[in-house]
């Protein structure tokens, strides 16, 4: 009962206990880490933080997809990363999208060439993809999850 009152657990309609939003909280420091020269931190406080609330605007339309390959490394998407994708059949020029092109599944930047949509890699070792047949947008990449180490 106490975990329910604090927002960690909730009951479903069929009386099953499941995790509620606060169950997934992590601590977020209110002090940023400097990526340049080190700075002195005298006291680091931490506030509750939920990754889903930070990354996901539309939970029912958001999926996670593992990345294989290195065609997007120049925009920071590496092999083994997980892209957070908001499902949508449309995207804007310049959006990083997950798409199917000629029955192939890929993550690339949506662009235009001679008025027609193309998929742009972020690695000079890969060519621009110009659809010979169909291009279908599955969704737009809105975030990224990466694990370091083991």
Locations of the language-model features?
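Short, positionally conserved secondary-structure boundary motifs
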Residues: 2-78, 143-150
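Acidic/glycine-rich C-terminal interaction modules and beta/coil loop segments
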Residues: 58-150
């Amino acid at each position: 009962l106490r975990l329910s009152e604090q927002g960690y657990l909730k009951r479903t309609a069929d009386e099953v206990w499941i995790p509620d939003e606060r169950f997934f909280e992590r601590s977020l420091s209110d002090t940023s880490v400097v990526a340049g020269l080190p700075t002195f931190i005298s006291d680091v406080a931490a506030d509750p933080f939920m990754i889903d609330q930070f990354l996901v605007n539309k939970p029912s339309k958001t999926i996670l997809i593992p990345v294989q390959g290195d065609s997007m490394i120049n925009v920071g998407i590496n092999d083994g990363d997980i892209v957070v994708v908001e499902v949508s059949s449309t995207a804007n020029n310049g959006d990083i999208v997950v798409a199917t092109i000629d029955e192939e599944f890929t993550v690339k930047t949506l662009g235009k060439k001679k008025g027609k949509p193309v998929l742009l890699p972020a690695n000079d070792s890969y060519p621009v993809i110009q659809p010979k047949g169909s291009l279908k947008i599955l969704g737009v990449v809105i975030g990224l999850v990466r694990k370091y180490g083991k």
